[in-house]
Amino acid sequence: WLRIMGYDAIYSNKYEDWKILEIAQNQNRIIITRDRSIYTKSLRRHLKCILLSPDSDIVKDLAYIAYKTRIDLSVNVNYTRCTECNSVLEKIGENKWICPRCKKNYWKGRHWRTIEEIIIKANSELLKLEEKHDIRRASNNTRTELRNRSNSNTDSKKVNLREV
């Protein structure tokens, strides 16, 4: 989901904990996990880490990630990344894109409505979180700037995602 929204995210269940911690430290990434053990290890190393609830769904997960990181929960197809290899997609036609690295094709199909619905629900959940914790919501410009910075080569905001 983070890649769909244009964020540079590493995802793999193949990495052992030490490798995830090393990548997060060397590349200034945020670890997102349901694994309490790696969460504890990351805190001991003073790394940025978000512990997701083991029973939450994608809507609540996205809202919580946005709450903790201030990212923008929206999809701009000009920034969308390949869900397989993380490369920024290239437009090849109206509502069609291709990954320049792995050559996977993407298009706006019926699944697009589901993506939009989940993003809308996640933003609604984010507002509830912010109201619950009495935090004033960042402007859309601030959140969008974070995503745009993620797509530039300077000072990028990176996310290391590990689902357990």
Regions found by a protein language model. Give the residues of each.
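Intrinsic-disorder-associated, low-complexity terminal segments enriched in Asp/Asn/His/Tyr and depleted
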Residues: 134, 140-141, 148-155, 160
